[in-house]
């Protein structure tokens, strides 16, 4: 496998999908060099800058997404309609530098990968 896409489609709290996804990415980044992250649906909430997880007595692991640049992971994509549906269409709200794509181009980018793993 040359290129792997990790798709985050769940909210950061209430399940452990996001944290587990981040752990898997960090684990495989030493053997797979072309990794991209896609955020769609409630998954766009994973990368909000001003998440207040302490209000629900949860640990804020989402700030850990920032360390991905150390692992040379730089391809981050958000679904534009998912952002609009949640009232989040502003580039400065995210902890990562994301490329915001409409549904068509989001799918084109996703199809360019050899494997897709959803969290």
Swiss-Prot record:
It comes from the Bacteria. Transmembrane segments: none annotated. It is found in: Cytoplasm. GO terms for biological process: tRNA processing. SUPFAM superfamilies: DsrEFH-like. Keywords: Cytoplasm, tRNA processing. The keyword Disulfide bond does not apply. GO terms for cellular component: cytoplasm. InterPro entries: DsrEFH-like, Sulphur_relay_DsrE/F-like, Sulphur_relay_TusC, Sulphur_relay_TusC/DsrF. It holds the Pfam family DsrE. Gene3D superfamilies: DsrEFH-like. Belongs to the DsrF/TusC family. Part of a sulfur-relay system required for 2-thiolation of 5-methylaminomethyl-2-thiouridine (mnm(5)s(2)U) at tRNA wobble positions. Heterohexamer, formed by a dimer of trimers. The hexameric TusBCD complex contains 2 copies each of TusB, TusC and TusD. The TusBCD complex interacts with TusE. This is Protein TusC. It comes from Buchnera aphidicola subsp. Schizaphis graminum (strain Sg).
């Amino acid at each position: 496998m040359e290129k792997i896409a990790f798709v985050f489609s769940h909210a950061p709290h209430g399940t452990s999908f996001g944290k587990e996804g981040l752990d898997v990415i960090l684990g495989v980044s030493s053997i797979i060099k072309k990794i991209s992250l896609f955020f769609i649906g409630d998954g766009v909430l994973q990368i909000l800058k001003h998440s207040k997880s302490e209000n629900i007595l949860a640990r804020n692991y989402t700030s850990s997404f920032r360390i991905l640049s150390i692992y040379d992971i730089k391809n981050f994509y958000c679904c534009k309609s998912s952002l609009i549906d949640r009232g989040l269409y502003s580039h400065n709200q995210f902890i990562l530098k994301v490329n915001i794509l409409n549904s068509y181009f989001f799918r084109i980018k996703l199809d360019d990968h050899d494997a897709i793993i959803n969290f």
